[in-house]
Amino acid sequence: SFGGVKANVDISMNVEKGKIVGLIGPNGSGKTTLFNSIVGTYPIDNGSIKFNGKEVSELPVPVIAKLGLLRTFQQTRIYGKLNCIENMLISHKGSDANLMKIFSKIPKELTEKAENLLNFVGLYQKRKLRAGDLSFGQQKLLELAMALMNEPEMLLLDEPTAGINPTLINGIIDRLIKVNQDFGITLLVIEHNMRVIMQLAENIFCLAH
């Protein structure tokens, strides 16, 4: 609750491992708030949140992330002045917050992993380009690749196609399906574009006001 305003009430949902599940609902219905609660950003007042059978509702964000539960955002969280490879390396769960330490001695296999994932999302040719110079759609793909660097078991995607050129949407749909099928990652997707969610999701939950 926020100052007496209850954001998510009487919600019960189960996301089956290995599936793509959609989450829809009108603006203000609490979809993003639910995501923030699942990953530990917002504490819950009561109820339970379990991941792989483990109660996670009282765990901090970094601990939940290390368990393999990650999310992306409506507005991308990238480092605009760093190039794509550097963004990938700094997002890795084993990275120190000190940039000099991260980039002074990088294991070859980590760089190769970053390059392979950038190739997977179609950004290999732009790997040395500053992230701030990418289009918004390309930044979304970079953020997806950054999440994949940490090998999540489950990924929460908050409107992955919002603000993207319609001609690029099919490519993003295809890549998300490949993330699920090739990497075995469970996806929970907030999306307002019903065409997208119908193509992606096997099951869909709807939040009402």
What are these regions (language model features)?
Residues 24-26:
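The feature captures the beta-strand-to-loop junction immediately N-terminal to the Walker
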